[in-house]
């Protein structure tokens, strides 16, 4: 969040997008070529962040309020919501400070602003890493609940879940501090990209295996009740569609940001890569959108959580 220059958002040292009036159009890159640039209006960015913030606060509140939701699965879901909350909140704070500085409504020394920028960047980066980790943890938890159903409660205990949560948070903070300190080292950026790909592969393998097991189970039930094959095919199509949506949203929302990091290492001066760098704010907006979608996929599908959430909202009124 530098006071001057072109850097506007999270991890300002990675962002080469110049401040511009919100638009969708052609912009000149460093070589004079024309390329597509999508600028996100500050109002839209803040609005999406606010929606995500409120949504995830409700999830955390509902899980904390209902003791029936104090299980390992909901522990991971709560931590995912907390991570998404921090992603949205830190980006909103950074954007608000930038706007206040640009408007002259906030006066601060460059050293103070730089320290604030470092703190916000660490919070944002650590919450991003923890969000990815908790998405993977939820996938592992669901996998164990399906393939080791009889031993699930002895394998995934609340103390073990809490230790896993603590390890994820500590590792996320430590690695984010290293990333902020050594952002200009290619190895650091590549480690982040490899981490993202590892989470993507982990989730894909686990969910595909779970889908295959569910299809086998449905086929067995169909044979037991002598149902016709189309019913089993319909179940398989619905499962495949759900899996495609889940992994597709994950890749669409997170992929562009990590593509950005990859291109910084591979082609920092190439005209085509420079065009992609100009859309850094768009990539951050997609991550905010993921923070909005996560509760819809992982939290609000629970009837117990929805009931608790309704009670929380009614009590607040």
Curated annotation (Swiss-Prot):
Q: Biological process GO terms, please?
A: adenylate cyclase-activating G protein-coupled receptor signaling pathway
Record has Lipoprotein as a keyword: yes
Q: How does it sit in the membrane?
A: Multi-pass membrane protein
Bilayer-crossing regions: 38-63, 73-93, 119-140, 164-183, 192-211, 241-266, 280-300
Where in the cell does this protein reside? Cell membrane
Ranges in the topological domain labelled Cytoplasmic: 64-72, 141-163, 212-240, 301-317
Domain of life from the UniProt record? Eukaryota
For the Extracellular compartment, the record's topological domain ranges are 1-37, 94-118, 184-191, 267-279
Q: What is its main location?
A: membrane
Residues carrying a glycan: 29
Which keywords does UniProt give here? Cell membrane, G-protein coupled receptor, Glycoprotein, Lipoprotein, Membrane, Palmitate, Receptor, Transducer, Transmembrane, Transmembrane helix
As for what it does, the entry says: Receptor for MSH (alpha, beta and gamma) and ACTH. The activity of this receptor is mediated by G proteins which activate adenylate cyclase. Mediates melanogenesis, the production of eumelanin (black/brown) and phaeomelanin (red/yellow), via regulation of cAMP signaling in melanocytes.
Protein name listed in UniProt = Melanocyte-stimulating hormone receptor
């Amino acid at each position: 969040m530098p006071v001057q220059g072109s850097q506007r958002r999270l991890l300002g040292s990675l962002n080469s997008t110049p401040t511009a009036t919100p638009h969708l159009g052609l912009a000149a890159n460093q070589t004079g070529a024309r390329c597509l640039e999508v600028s996100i209006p500050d109002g839209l960015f803040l609005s999406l962040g606010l929606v995500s913030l409120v949504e995830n606060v409700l999830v955390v509140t509902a899980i904390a309020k209902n003791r029936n939701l104090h299980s390992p699965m909901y522990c991971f879901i709560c931590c995912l919501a907390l991570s998404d909350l921090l992603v949205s909140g830190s980006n909103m704070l950074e954007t608000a400070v930038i706007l206040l500085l640009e408007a002259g409504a906030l006066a601060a020394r460059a050293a103070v602003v730089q320290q604030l920028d470092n703190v916000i960047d660490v919070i944002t980066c650590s919450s991003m890493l923890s969000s990815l980790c908790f998405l993977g943890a939820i996938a592992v938890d669901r996998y164990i609940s399906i393939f080791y159903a009889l031993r699930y409660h002895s394998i995934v205990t609340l103390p073990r879940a809490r230790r896993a949560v603590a390890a994820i948070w500590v590792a996320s903070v430590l690695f984010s501090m290293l990333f902020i300190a050594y952002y200009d080292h290619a190895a650091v950026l590549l480690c982040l990209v490899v981490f993202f790909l590892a989470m993507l592969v982990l989730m894909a393998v686990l969910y595909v295996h779970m889908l295959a097991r569910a299809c086998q189970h449905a086929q067995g039930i169909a044979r037991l009740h002598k149902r016709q094959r189309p019913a089993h095919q319909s179940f398989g199509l619905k499962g495949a569609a759900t899996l495609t949506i889940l992994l597709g949203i994950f890749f669409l929302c997170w992929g562009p940001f990590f593509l950005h990091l990859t291109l910084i290492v591979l082609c920092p001066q190439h005209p085509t890569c420079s065009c992609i760098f100009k859309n850094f704010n768009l990539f951050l907006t997609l991550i905010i959108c993921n923070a909005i979608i996560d509760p819809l996929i992982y939290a609000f599908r629970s009837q117990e959580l929805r009931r608790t959430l309704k009670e929380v909202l009614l009590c607040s009124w």
